[in-house]
């Protein structure tokens, strides 16, 4: 076999491959054997038909076609390895010459990873939010905890903001009561905004037994998006009573003996959360600067596939779980289809660039992934997918996507290398030490997925859906 590589552009090549006919012998033998098992000829046992009879009865062309189809992948792979090419996706193959007994010649055009020169990233400087926890934030956190321990007591008065009312609901569209538009005994906190628009105004001021009618656009169900005439009847009113903020509350709501200890713990938790957010912010901003420094050509077909994958994931997984279609989603977001497609394309370009650069950095820095790192990463991904580690691991293995997980961890480590070399300061001008924030680095790297990663997510989500249906 002879092969030659022609570079069409930085991301696409054409392979020209010539195969002497004697190198097709194994494929020709396999073709005769396959046809032998598929056909019957009177006078011959199945599988024992001579080659000359097959040629006479079914044509030499059918045999050659079968042999070529068998041989192409093998010779294409040999040519790719010989040319030391890092190919992306499937090739477009064109058979240019096929002379029986003499020669098979074909070309294969395929996308390849572009050669990328890693820029000097040591001079990157970024600014992040300062790690500050205010007294107001601590008070808010404690107040939220206090809300969780609120008690409700029945009252004989008109309902007011913050009260918990028990209500019966009936929705009509065009004068007809909807089959799924009746609900009794619903508990609702006035002012929470958790039900229909207009319900707060309707129930405020009503006592138990009181009734009101209002018009509201339905947020779900069989008549989603339509205006409905909603009748609400209050059957009970209860006032929420918050516990006193004192040491007794601290002992009831936590493992601490005093309110001051509870507040100190709340402050510490807020600091930890902000520390993680600060690290993630640093990685995102360092990554943005790195992308600005590097020239990364994007293969057109890879970009088109990635855009399609992102659209598919949004429509069939994320929106499907929320009961929305793309049209409704865009309406809620206030975006046109053109704006959505432009944004999706920009996100895809960023994702591909990020993967190319970080993968190149992994090779340059010779970064490896050990079993412990891979296991920890798998458990985090499983949790984010709402699956058990065993379920997620099975889906990944069945989809042949273990290398995808390894790549994610490696890219996270590569990004951490860039962040470590960068100068990160907060809005107060203080240098930020991001040492040991590897988990946040991985999280930032995972926000940019190439098609392989997105495909694995599809498989994991499909697996989860199948198990749910079987249950």
Swiss-Prot record:
Signal peptide, first to last residue: none
Keywords in alphabetical order: Cell cycle, Cell division, Chaperone, Cytoplasm, Isomerase, Rotamase
Catalytic activity: [protein]-peptidylproline (omega=180) = [protein]-peptidylproline (omega=0)
Listed GO biological process terms: 'de novo' cotranslational protein folding; cell division; chaperone-mediated protein folding; protein transport; protein unfolding
PROSITE patterns hit by this protein: FKBP_PPIASE (PS50059)
E.C. designation(s): 5.2.1.8
Gene3D superfamilies per UniProt: 3.10.50.40, Trigger factor ribosome-binding domain, Trigger factor, C-terminal domain
GO molecular function, one term: peptidyl-prolyl cis-trans isomerase activity
A GO cellular component annotation in the UniProt record: cytoplasm
Cellular compartment(s): Cytoplasm
Stored Pfam families: FKBP_C (PF00254), Trigger_C (PF05698), Trigger_N (PF05697)
Domain PPIase FKBP-type, chain residue ranges per copy: 162-243
Region (Disordered): 431-471
Enzyme category, top tier: isomerase
Tagged with keyword Transmembrane: no
Residue ranges with Basic and acidic residues bias: 456-471
Family: Belongs to the FKBP-type PPIase family. Tig subfamily.
Family annotation (HAMAP family): Trigger_factor_Tig
Protein task: Involved in protein export. Acts as a chaperone by maintaining the newly synthesized protein in an open conformation. Functions as a peptidyl-prolyl cis-trans isomerase.
Record text about domains: Consists of 3 domains; the N-terminus binds the ribosome, the middle domain has PPIase activity, while the C-terminus has intrinsic chaperone activity on its own.
Protein's recorded name: Trigger factor
Native organism: Streptomyces griseus subsp. griseus (strain JCM 4626 / CBS 651.72 / NBRC 13350 / KCC S-0626 / ISP 5235)
Gene behind the chain: tig
């Amino acid at each position: 076999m002879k092969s030659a590589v022609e570079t069409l552009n930085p991301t696409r090549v054409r392979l020209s491959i010539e195969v002497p006919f004697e190198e097709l012998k194994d494929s020709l033998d396999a073709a005769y054997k396959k046809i032998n098992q598929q056909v019957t000829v009177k006078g011959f046992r199945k599988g024992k038909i001579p080659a000359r009879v097959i040629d006479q009865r079914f044509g030499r062309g059918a045999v050659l076609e079968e042999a070529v189809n068998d041989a192409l992948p093998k010779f294409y792979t040999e040519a790719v390895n010989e040319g030391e090419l890092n190919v992306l996706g499937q090739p477009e193959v064109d058979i240019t010459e096929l002379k029986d007994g003499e020669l098979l010649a074909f070309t294969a055009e395929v996308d390849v990873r572009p050669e990328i020169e890693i820029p000097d990233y040591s001079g990157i400087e970024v600014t992040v939010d300062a790690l500050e926890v205010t007294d107001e934030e601590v008070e808010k956190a404690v107040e939220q905890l206090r809300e969780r321990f609120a008690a409700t007591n029945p009252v004989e008065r008109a309902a007011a903001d913050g009260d918990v009312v028990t209500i019966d609901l009936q929705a009509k569209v065009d004068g007809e009561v909807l089959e799924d538009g009746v609900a009794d005994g619903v508990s609702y906190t006035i002012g929470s905004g958790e039900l229909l628009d207009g319900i707060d105004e309707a129930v405020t001021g009503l006592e138990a037994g009181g009734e009101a009618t209002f018009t509201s656009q339905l947020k779900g169900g069989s008549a989603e998006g339509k205006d409905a005439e909603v009748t609400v009847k209050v059957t009970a009113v209860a006032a929420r009573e918050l516990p006193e903020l004192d040491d007794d509350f601290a002992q009831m709501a936590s493992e601490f003996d005093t309110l001051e200890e509870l507040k100190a713990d709340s402050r510490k938790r807020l600091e930890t959360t902000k520390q993680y957010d600060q690290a993630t912010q640093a990685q995102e901003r360092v990554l943005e600067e790195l992308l600005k420094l590097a020239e990364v050509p994007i293969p057109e077909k890879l970009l088109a596939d990635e855009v399609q994958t992102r659209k598919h994931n949004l429509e069939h997984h994320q929106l499907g779980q929320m009961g929305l279609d793309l049209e409704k989603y865009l309406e809620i977001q206030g975006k046109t289809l053109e704006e959505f497609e432009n944004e999706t394309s920009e996100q895809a370009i960023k994702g591909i660039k990020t993967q190319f650069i970080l993968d190149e950095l992994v090779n340059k820095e010779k970064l490896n992934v050990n079993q412990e790192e891979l296991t920890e990463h798998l458990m985090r991904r499983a949790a984010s997918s709402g699956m058990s580690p065993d379920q997620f691991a099975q889906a990944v293995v069945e989809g042949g996507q273990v290398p995808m997980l390894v790549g994610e961890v490696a890219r996270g480590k590569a990004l951490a290398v860039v962040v470590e070399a960068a100068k990160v300061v907060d809005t107060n001008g203080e240098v930020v030490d991001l040492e040991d924030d590897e988990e946040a680095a991985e999280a930032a790297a995972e926000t940019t997925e190439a098609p392989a990663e997105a495909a694995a997510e599809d498989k994991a989500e499909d697996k989860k859906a199948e198990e749910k249906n079987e249950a």
